[in-house]
Amino acid sequence: RDAPRAGPVQPEVRERLKALTERAKVWAIVLNETTERVPVYAGTGALTTRSVIQMNEMAERVGVDAVSVITPYFISPTDDELYRHYVAIADATALPVILYSNPGRTGGLQLSTDLVTKLSSHENIVGIKDSSGDLTQTMAYIEATEKDFAVLLGRDTLIYAGLIHGAKGAITAT
């Protein structure tokens, strides 16, 4: 029996394009079915800034209302790197950008309060979905940002408490 050999792995461009096209089809179906009754947000987070920008371009063409961009996963960027990542994304789209902090899905990476405060001054970054499950962190985002910046809960169990403390709403998984 031959042992597997190590070698470079090339991403399959056709499969990636197919996946992007399928995402766009899903967004279009959701937009069609909701008939503008509710805003439609597209989750466009990816490993690279370039990939997020490409997905945002597709989301913009389809006509979604905003994009939600999770922090990059599998890597541990610094706050400066995350700042440049999110600013490049926000600068490259006309769509409102919602930051998405979900440490449980990104190897423990949490957007710091200082970083969110700094990013909240960008005219195209309109809010953050906080799925940390840490109400203290959510409250820190609320206290550190202006009233027009939407801090949204991502944990169902914290919606009520978050709203009491000033969160603007929730984007739930259920």
Residue ranges and their predicted role:
Residues R1-G108:
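Active-site beta->alpha loop and helix N-cap motifs at the rims of alpha/beta catalytic domains
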Residues D91-A92, G104-T174:
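Catalytic alpha/beta core domains of metabolic enzymes, predominantly
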